[in-house]
């Protein structure tokens, strides 16, 4: 990185660029493909989900943090991860859905396990790859505080704002119409994925955890009960903070 450019300024410009680019693509979809049924819609929607990764690659190259696009993908996808990071990648969905089940805030869809396996590959494009931007790039550049909780609070706000243009598309049903509940769910997952990133070098464990959470929604949906969501998020924050504290100790 250029020694005259701080990590904090990079984080700010990265967030603004990713948010603006996503908003613009979302508006193009609404203007030219409002019914959401054409090939153009699908391609642009994939592009929206890839913007965090694309902007991270561009920033990494421009700032000379990596020498080539090949080096970027190697650093993101081909790192040798610790066994603990893989364990956490599978444990995070257990935390999210397990606590929700204990709080009786889950509706089982009745779909078969086959539906999970069929949907799982799609979540690589529709969710998983955004982790390259948020966790691998932005979390690393949020250097305003050494403390985990303030960094996650800031990251959760950026991640929440990024989702808004996506969930304004008329055919998207994944987002809650209640923006408070929507933000709280984003907040909890920010802490879980953020804790996982503290243990991983690249982005693959975070991508896997994200894909598992999204894919399991085919089988069970976390409901929008405010009290249960607050309890869920509180547990996620406490568990994530404990996981990070163990690593630092």
Describe the residue ranges of each PLM region.
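Juxtamembrane helix-entry segments on the extracytoplasmic side of multipass membrane proteins
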Residues: 108-120, 171-184
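Membrane-interface helix/loop boundary segments of multi-pass membrane proteins
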Residues: 21, 129-156, 198-202
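Residue-level hotspots within the lipid-embedded alpha helices of multi-pass solute transporters
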Residues: 94, 123-128, 160, 182-187
